[in-house]
Structure formats: C-alpha cells, structure tokens
Amino acid sequence: MFQISLDMISNKINLLGLLPEAYAPFDHIVDVLPIIPILFFLLAFVWQASVKFR
C-alpha cells in the first residue's frame, strides 16, 4: 500500500517536471533559469568588492 502511494507521488512529480510539447524548444533555457538568482547573489559580492565593502 505504501509503495503504491509512493509510485503515485513519483508519477505526479514526473508529469509536473515535463514541459508541454509546444514549449520543447525552450527546454534548455528552462534548465538554466534556476541558476539566475544565484548569479545575482554572486554579482552583489563582486559589486561590493569593487566599492571596497563600504
């Protein structure tokens, strides 16, 4: 019973993780999008280093 519910949850996660066919060309872009906030966070440190952490 527990295994069946785990299988159902994993199937739902897999379905939510796939883009519809119409958006297939953007699949590689979507893979990179979560990295963008990290880049802004690192940019803040570079900016502060350039102004000597005032």
Curated annotation (Swiss-Prot):
One of its GO terms (biological process) is photosynthesis. The keyword Plastid applies. Residues 1-17 form a propeptide. InterPro entries: PSII_PsbK, PSII_PsbK_sf. The chain crosses the membrane at residues 29-49. One of its GO terms (cellular component) is chloroplast thylakoid membrane. It is found in: Plastid, Chloroplast thylakoid membrane. It is a single-pass membrane protein. It comes from the Eukaryota. Keywords: Chloroplast, Membrane, Photosynthesis, Photosystem II, Plastid, Reaction center, Thylakoid, Transmembrane, Transmembrane helix. One of the components of the core complex of photosystem II (PSII). PSII is a light-driven water:plastoquinone oxidoreductase that uses light energy to abstract electrons from H(2)O, generating O(2) and a proton gradient subsequently used for ATP formation. It consists of a core antenna complex that captures photons, and an electron transfer chain that converts photonic excitation into a charge separation. Belongs to the PsbK family. PSII is composed of 1 copy each of membrane proteins PsbA, PsbB, PsbC, PsbD, PsbE, PsbF, PsbH, PsbI, PsbJ, PsbK, PsbL, PsbM, PsbT, PsbY, PsbZ, Psb30/Ycf12, at least 3 peripheral proteins of the oxygen-evolving complex and a large number of cofactors. It forms dimeric complexes. NCBIfam families: PRK02553.1 (NF002715). This is Photosystem II reaction center protein K. It comes from Euglena stellata.
